[in-house]
């Protein structure tokens, strides 16, 4: 399956291995970051 790389939005797709979906304080603009 497809996964989001680092810095890619993860609103509708999950992040690749070793990455975690993080959002800003408002809970928007979720992007994948290193764990």
Swiss-Prot record:
InterPro entries: Spidertoxin (IPR004169)
GO terms for cellular component: extracellular region
Summary of the function given for this chain in its UniProt record: Inhibits P2RX3 receptors. Has an analgesic effect in rat. Enhances the high-affinity desensitization of P2RX3 purinoceptors. At 50 nM, decreases the IC(50) for ambient ATP from 46.5 nM to 12.7 nM in mouse P2RX3.
CDD domains named among the record's database cross-references: Spider_toxin
Cell compartments where the protein resides: Secreted
Further information: Negative results: does not affect mouse P2RX2 or P2RX2/P2RX3 receptors.
Domain of life of the organism encoding this protein: Eukaryota
Family per similarity comment: Belongs to the neurotoxin 33 family.
An example Gene Ontology molecular-function term: toxin activity
Signal peptide extent: none
Domain-related comment: The presence of a 'disulfide through disulfide knot' structurally defines this protein as a knottin.
Tissue specificity comment: Expressed by the venom gland.
Protein name per UniProt: Purotoxin-1
Disulfide feature: 3-16, 10-21, 15-32, 23-30
Organism (species): Alopecosa marikovskyi (Wolf spider)
Keyword vocabulary terms for this entry: Calcium channel impairing toxin, Disulfide bond, Ion channel impairing toxin, Knottin, Neurotoxin, Secreted, Toxin
């Amino acid at each position: 399956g497809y996964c989001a790389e680092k810095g890619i939005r993860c609103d509708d797709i999950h992040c690749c291995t070793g990455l975690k979906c993080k959002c800003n304080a408002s809970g928007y603009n979720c992007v994948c970051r290193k764990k």
